[in-house]
């Protein structure tokens, strides 16, 4: 581990960090120099910067918690306005806007989507409202039927099915992942990808540069291309201070021939299949789609693939005729991401919509629980109107500070009647919700600010599919393996409380 950290420090990432620190130091130094040479001018510049930043923050559409914290930060002389300028707001260039508009015009629309929505409106108005809300937030989402959905309650079971489906690929394979690490899981997949590329199958791979900076060598895209795999890093790290570094590609998508797709919480590394142990048993989940619903994940991948590249291939070549399946119910794969790429917080709004219309039960698993006032109130209100609301978080954390903040959310929720559990065997990384045994969502979205505000994410909303019974079974097994938290069991020292309060305060802007 120490050798890996040394390698990371001496790599391009360490160099980029050094350059960015130098840039920041240079700007800060110039301000100090100006303060010595022309103090009156310096004061005028400081006042102007602070006022301009405050006006920009007040007029910007953002979460109230984020707005308040940025206003607080702005009052720190020199540093505050500079931090907001560099990390507070991302603006798209004219070139990026044109590219985004071109990509948005390329649709894989489901032919009978309108009929499906109309039938749902007649049969179940509450369910129609949830789905209509999602479609209005994400113009790329659509409603699909005749799609089989298979739920996996562990990384190990999903991995084996992924290998079998990869071996059957004939036309193309798309992979988009946050973390990839050499080992049993990834190497077994890579061997098949190399074989398929040699057979003429088109293989595209996208992985997050920061997500993989400690797991893959800097030249790994070159290594993959030498094996016939077209590979790129998402949001590549370069020696420049920019707010875009906060926007990571946290998605996990595998698409095979436009017919089969996988997504969920499972990255391509050995801890996700429990081949190695990091934090006890690694509990994760995922879902496999087979049929027309795969179109949405195919398009979502292509949107991300081309968003930072100025050429666009014809999407129609990947718009293959899906073989309809016998799957019951509806599925709506969707994406979420940061502004201004996405108009609203899709991941958060879907959860709120589901929770607000719940009448019987709401079950949630999340590795982190750091949520804003709106979502907290939705959860509390559901519990107070008699809905059985249960949230499961890890007993063994991957980040102790994050667990401290997560546990800080417990008292408020418990007081409203929400039941909270911690998964005893280890670290629960599953990101799923089950509502009234009719709706479920499985994907990559954590209940924290980074996932809900800053990262590119994806999930699949399910309505009355066969897989919902398996999700319900998984929840019951999780509850049985977890310890319930009660108000009298929460004990923190004054030091822990102080750290928790400070961390919670700044969470919205981190």
Region spans (language model):
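Transmembrane alpha-helices and immediately adjacent membrane-cytoplasm interface residues
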Residues: 45-116
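Charged, low-complexity intrinsically disordered terminal segments
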Residues: 2-23, 27-40, 114-510
């Amino acid at each position: 581990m120490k050798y890996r950290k040394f390698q990371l420090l001496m790599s391009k990432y360490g160099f980029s960090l050094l350059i960015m620190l130098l840039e920041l130091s240079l700007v800060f130094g110039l301000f100090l120099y100006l303060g010595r040479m022309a103090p009156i001018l310096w004061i005028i510049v400081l006042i102007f910067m602070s006022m301009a930043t405050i006006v920009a923050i007040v007029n910007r559409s953002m979460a109230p918690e984020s707005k308040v914290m940025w206003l607080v930060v702005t009052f720190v002389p020199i540093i505050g306005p500079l931090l907001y300028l560099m990390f507070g707001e991302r603006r798209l260039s004219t070139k990026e806007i044109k590219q985004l508009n071109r990509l948005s015009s390329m649709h894989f629309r489901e032919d009978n989507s309108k009929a499906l929505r109309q039938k749902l409106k007649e049969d179940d108005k509450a369910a129609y409202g949830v789905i209509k809300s999602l479609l209005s937030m994400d113009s790329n989402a659509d409603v699909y039927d005749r799609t089989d959905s298979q739920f996996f309650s562990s990384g190990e079971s999903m991995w084996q099915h992924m290998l079998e489906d990869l071996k059957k690929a004939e036309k193309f394979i798309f992979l988009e992942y946050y973390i990839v690490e050499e080992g049993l899981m990834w190497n077994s997949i890579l061997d098949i990808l190399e074989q398929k590329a040699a057979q003429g199958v088109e293989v595209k791979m996208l992985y997050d540069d920061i997500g993989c900076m400690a797991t893959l060598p800097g030249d790994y895209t070159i290594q993959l291309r030498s094996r016939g795999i077209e590979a790129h890093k998402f949001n590549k790290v370069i020696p420049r201070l920019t707010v875009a570094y906060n926007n990571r590609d946290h998605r996990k998508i595998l698409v095979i021939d436009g017919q089969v797709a996988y997504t969920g919480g499972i990255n391509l590394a050995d801890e996700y299949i429990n081949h190695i142990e990091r934090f006890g048993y690694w509990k994760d989940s995922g879902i496999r789609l087979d049929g027309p619903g795969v179109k949405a994940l195919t398009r979502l991948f292509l949107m991300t693939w081309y968003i930072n590249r100025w050429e666009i291939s014809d999407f129609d070549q990947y718009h293959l005729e899906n073989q309809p399946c016998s799957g019951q119910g509806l599925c709506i794969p969707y994406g979420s991401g940061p502004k201004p790429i996405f108009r609203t917080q899709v991941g958060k709004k879907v959860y709120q919509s589901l929770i607000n219309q719940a009448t019987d039960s709401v079950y949630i698993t999340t590795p982190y629980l750091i949520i804003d006032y709106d979502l907290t109130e939705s959860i509390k209100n559901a519990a107070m109107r008699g809905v059985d609301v249960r949230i499961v978080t890890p007993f063994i954390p991957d980040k102790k500070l994050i667990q401290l903040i997560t546990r800080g959310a417990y008292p408020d929720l418990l007081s409203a009647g929400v039941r909270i559990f911690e998964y005893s065997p280890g670290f629960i990384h599953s990101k799923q919700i089950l509502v009234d045994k009719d709706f479920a969502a499985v994907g990559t979205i954590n209940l924290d600010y980074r996932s809900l505000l800053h990262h590119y994410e994806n999930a699949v909303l399910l309505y009355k599919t066969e897989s919902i019974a398996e999700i319900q079974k998984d929840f019951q097994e999780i509850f049985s393996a977890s310890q319930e938290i009660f108000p009298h069991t929460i004990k923190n020292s004054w030091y822990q409380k102080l750290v928790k309060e400070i961390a919670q305060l700044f969470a919205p802007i981190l």
